[in-house]
Amino acid sequence: MGMGGSGRQSLTKLATFIANYELFQIEVNKTYSMENWKNDLKKVLKRAGADGKKIVFLFTDLQIKDESFLEDVSMILTTGEVPNLFAADEKAEILDRVQHTAREEGRELGETSFANLYNIFMTNVKSNLHIVLAMSPVGTRSVTLTIYKHSF
């Protein structure tokens, strides 16, 4: 939280670089849709959870085109996932990637059931994905952000 120009994004980018993490930001334009949002979420969750990449997701108040964007971010922060984001075939692909990544890193997976592999995916998301909300306390979204802030 801070006024525009106070360096929230610059400091986040610097810290991301120093920590050797990947920076992920969405690129919102006039045609950015809910489908684009869901695809971006899938991409970042797969990178963090299936590929085991350390990622900082920098999300600003100017990128909120729909209130459901905040709801999805809230779900990721509280549970590590967005319900019904992935179709069954996408989940199968994710679990294959989890197995592949674990083998490359020389980790023991133990039981390779769907539930166990999905738990590994969720654990990876929770430990590898860091979400930074760069918000301004002033402007049209301040009421929404105040309500959102108090929900935690």
Positions of predicted regions on the chain:
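Conformational switch/transducer regions in large eukaryotic molecular machines and scaffolds
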Residues: 1-152
